[in-house]
């Protein structure tokens, strides 16, 4: 009994190791297949770019070009069609004739130039990040611009003195108006003072009458 017990667990141990080896072989085989050549989309774009036909490259002509490049067209026929559809949807290829994978295809010049532009944009974006930091500095300048707001507030205070000055000016005309009536009563007072001067000759008459009384006394 003791001899048979260790033999039973020893049997499943190699059974567990074998699937690990199979998985490793499958992953190595998949890696070899992927590394065997470039993807279908790159081969299609190269074949379409190499053609000089203005109307575009047909599917049959494209397959011939791929076969000449050493690509197995018969086995990968479905991949070629899927690659064409994906390139058309992305905009790298333009379908001039037909629908789907069948028809004629032409390289999109805008997309070809656009592929080179993103690289330049990335380099430009890295440079643009530094000016972004410089753009933050003007924000500090906006903080310095806040005194302008306070400067705008001060004129409001200046307006109040101006209004007060206007009020004082408005008050001063009242004083001037009051001064005019004061001068007016003075002039009649002078006129009254002139009248008594004219009345003095009247008082001289009684003085002339006094000698008459003296003459009467002498009598």
Swiss-Prot record:
The C-terminal domain is required for high-affinity binding to chromatin. Residues 1-15 have a biased composition (Low complexity). One of its GO terms (molecular function) is structural constituent of chromatin. Residues 1-41, 92-219 are annotated as: Disordered. The gene is H1-4. It comes from Homo sapiens (Human). InterPro entries: H1/H5, Histone_H1/H5_H15, WH-like_DNA-bd_sf, WH_DNA-bd_sf. The modification Citrulline is found at residue 54. The modification N6-acetyllysine is found at residues 17, 26. This is Histone H1.4. It holds the Pfam family Linker_histone. GO terms for biological process: chromosome condensation; negative regulation of DNA recombination; negative regulation of transcription by RNA polymerase II; nucleosome assembly.
């Amino acid at each position: 009994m003791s001899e048979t017990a260790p033999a039973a667990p020893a049997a499943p141990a190699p059974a567990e190791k074998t699937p690990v080896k199979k998985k490793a072989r499958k992953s190595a085989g998949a890696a070899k297949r992927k590394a065997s050549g470039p993807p279908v989309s790159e081969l299609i774009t190269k074949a379409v770019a190499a053609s000089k036909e203005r109307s575009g490259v047909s599917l049959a002509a494209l397959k011939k070009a791929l076969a000449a490049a050493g690509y197995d067209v018969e086995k990968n026929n479905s991949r070629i069609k899927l690659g064409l559809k994906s390139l058309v949807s992305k905009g790298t290829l333009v379908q001039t004739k037909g629908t789907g994978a069948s028809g004629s295809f032409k390289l999109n010049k805008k997309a070809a130039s656009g592929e080179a532009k993103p690289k330049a944009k990335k380099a430009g974006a890295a440079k643009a990040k530094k000016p972004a930091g410089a753009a933050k500095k003007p924000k500090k300048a906006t903080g310095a611009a806040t005194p302008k707001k306070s400067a705008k507030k001060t004129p409001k205070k200046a307006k109040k003195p101006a209004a007060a000055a206007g009020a004082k000016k408005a008050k001063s005309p009242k004083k001037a108006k009051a001064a005019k009536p004061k001068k007016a009563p003075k002039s009649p007072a002078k006129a009254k003072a002139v009248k008594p001067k004219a009345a003095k000759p009247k008082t001289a008459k009684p003085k002339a009458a006094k000698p008459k009384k003296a003459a009467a006394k002498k009598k």
